[in-house]
């Protein structure tokens, strides 16, 4: 019998492997990305304190696009999270793609955050 592959379970296993290697500090926190079917979320996390420093998503009140699940929305979230991080004095981060392929919405968010001033 052939079993169907659960893509989200595979992603979670991949993310667990990645998280063993990626660790955010106060000087260089972790930029974590979560992607759902309708929205995209980004958090800047200090793993030493286990605290979220900055976050942005397509659910924010500042978000003004009609569609929340496309590349344009991801770019807007990347710009928002970078702007908020720079306001808090964070310039360098470690990028955590969350087990997703570095393509499409994840890549668009990362590129927009880089263009807005974050270094990774």
From Swiss-Prot:
Keyword rRNA-binding recorded: yes
Record key words, sorted: Ribonucleoprotein, Ribosomal protein, RNA-binding, rRNA-binding
Stored CDD domains: Ribosomal_L18_L5e (cd00432)
SUPFAM superfamilies: Translational machinery components
Function: This is one of the proteins that bind and probably mediate the attachment of the 5S RNA into the large ribosomal subunit, where it forms part of the central protuberance.
Subunit-level organization: Part of the 50S ribosomal subunit; part of the 5S rRNA/L5/L18/L25 subcomplex. Contacts the 5S and 23S rRNAs.
PANTHER family, A to Z: 39S RIBOSOMAL PROTEIN L18, MITOCHONDRIAL (PTHR12899), LARGE RIBOSOMAL SUBUNIT PROTEIN UL18M (PTHR12899:SF3)
NCBIfam families associated with the record: L18_bact
Record family assignment: Belongs to the universal ribosomal protein uL18 family.
Name under which the protein is recorded: Large ribosomal subunit protein uL18
Source organism: Geobacillus thermodenitrificans (strain NG80-2)
């Amino acid at each position: 019998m052939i079993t169907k592959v659960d893509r989200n379970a595979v992603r979670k296993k991949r993310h667990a492997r990645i998280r063993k290697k990626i660790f955010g500090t106060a000087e260089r926190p972790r930029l974590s990305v979560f992607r759902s079917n309708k929205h995209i979320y980004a958090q800047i996390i200090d793993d030493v304190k286990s605290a979220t420093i900055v976050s942005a998503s397509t659910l924010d009140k500042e978000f003004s696009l009609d569609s929340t699940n496309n590349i344009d929305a991801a770019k807007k979230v990347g710009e928002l999270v970078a702007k908020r991080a720079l306001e808090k004095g964070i310039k360098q981060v470690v990028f955590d793609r969350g087990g997703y392929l570095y393509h499409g919405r994840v890549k668009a968010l990362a590129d927009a955050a880089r263009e807005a001033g974050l270094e990774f």
